[in-house]
């Protein structure tokens, strides 16, 4: 471990003393650079960008491929991608700031902050005539249960009842533009783990308590203090030329997706800001968030969270509740996804925790998560290392994307161990 830390620090010196061009960043971790380049040269991915850093900042970044389907614009390290559910970590941090200020309590039912949820129901299934079987919920989820995805809210991509409910009009689809937040629970709060729209409700609570729109709260309390200049809900027109086309893998070919493409929007123009997704960012910007967590909540003199709060994020917050792979019911949106990669895992506050680490990679109780368009991150407090990998492909948990992520991770830790 000491050798690993020494190498990381020496890598930082190499990066810090050189110029900031792509060649310097690639030289810092040549094995990682090779992983990204190979994924592109072999045609597995159309675009890839990645970064690795530690407590001192970004040590390495690299991009390859093209940011457009026509392959006219070469990829760059500062390309802006849709990070989708990587938004959830930002929302969790924002909510934990309110906990520290004493205006939000982790173990209080969310009805204290959103009274209209006082009559929640649980969708038990459907009868023979396809009528929904809805039962009154025993209680509302707590704020902690929203952060840990034990609140009972799910996604229609991985839950058959939720998918059927949206098809029959019992609830709105996430893609409909309607009131998808009104969906019933899939199970009683605190009884199971399933990934879902829990963090979307957390965003609503932040807005209710702060009196600000979520985008404004993030700008003032997270993006501004961390000097994140390329993270936003509305993509500015002047930054469109750094955005990346979303592709779909169909019959082993990558084609341009007809929807969900990046589009410019005026700042403050969105009707709804989701705590569960919707942000654009770069690997450099998002790395600032992970670097802050490695520094126990502080970065460049700005304190975003107290050390004790950061500690709580990386502790098991779900007890004996077991995580399970997300079995797909919408294969065009997501493959079956095992975010533990076959290793023991639990859940902290806003983070999946690898309770025993990954052999040859991230250490025990490292945190991680991902975004729908196949962007992934990990933050390893033991090794003081973070990693980010991103492409823009559907469906989620794309085999080539996950393979590249894991090879990247192995390359980073292999080099640090030598």
Q: Residue ranges of each PLM-predicted region?
A:
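Short, surface-exposed beta-strand/loop micro-motifs that present aromatic residues
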Residues: 366, 373-386
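Short, surface-exposed loop or secondary-structure junction motifs
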Residues: 120-359
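Sec-dependent N-terminal signal peptides
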Residues: 4-12
């Amino acid at each position: 471990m000491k050798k690993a830390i020494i190498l990381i620090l020496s890598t930082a010196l190499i990066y810090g003393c050189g110029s900031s061009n792509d060649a310097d960043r690639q030289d810092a971790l040549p094995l990682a650079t090779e992983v990204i380049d190979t994924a592109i040269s072999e045609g597995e991915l159309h675009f890839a960008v990645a970064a690795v850093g530690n407590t001192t900042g970004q040590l390495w970044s690299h991009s390859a491929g093209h940011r457009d389907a026509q392959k006219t614009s070469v990829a760059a390290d500062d390309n802006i991608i849709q990070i989708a559910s990587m938004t959830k970590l930002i929302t969790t941090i924002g909510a934990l700031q309110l906990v520290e200020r004493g205006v939000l309590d982790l173990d209080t039912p969310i009805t204290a902050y959103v009274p209209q949820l006082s009559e929640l129901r649980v969708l038990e299934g459907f009868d023979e005539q396809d009528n929904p079987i809805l039962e009154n919920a025993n209680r509302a989820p707590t704020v902690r249960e929203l952060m840990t995805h034990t609140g009972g809210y799910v996604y229609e991509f991985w839950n058959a009842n939720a998918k059927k409910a949206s098809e029959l009009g019992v609830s709105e689809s996430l893609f409909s533009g309607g009131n998808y937040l009104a969906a019933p629970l899939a199970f009683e709060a605190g009884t199971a783990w399933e990934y879902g729209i829990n963090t979307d409700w957390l965003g609503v609570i932040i807005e209710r308590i702060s009196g600000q729109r979520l985008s404004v709260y993030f700008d003032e309390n997270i993006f501004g203090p961390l000097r994140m200049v390329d993270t936003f809900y509305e993509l500015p027109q002047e930054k469109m030329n750094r955005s990346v086309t979303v592709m779909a893998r169909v019959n082993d070919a990558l084609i341009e997706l007809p929807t969900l493409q990046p589009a410019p929007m005026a700042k403050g123009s969105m009707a709804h800001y989701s705590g569960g997704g919707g942000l654009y960012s770069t690997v450099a910007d998002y790395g600032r968030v992970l670097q802050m967590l490695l520094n126990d909540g502080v970065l460049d003199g700005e304190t975003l969270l107290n050390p004790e709060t950061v500690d709580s994020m990386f502790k098991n917050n779900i007890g004996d509740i077991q995580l399970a792979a997300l079995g797909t019911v919408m294969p065009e949106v997501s493959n079956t996804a095992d975010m533990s990669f076959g290793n023991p895992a639990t859940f902290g506050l806003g983070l999946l925790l690898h309770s025993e680490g990954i052999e040859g990679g991230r250490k025990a109780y490292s945190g991680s998560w991902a975004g729908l368009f196949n962007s992934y991150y990990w933050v390893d407090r033991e090794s003081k290392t973070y990693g980010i990998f991103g492409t823009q492909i559907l469906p989620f948990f794309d085999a080539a994307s996950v393979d590249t992520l894991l090879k990247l991770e192995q390359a980073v830790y292999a080099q640090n161990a030598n």
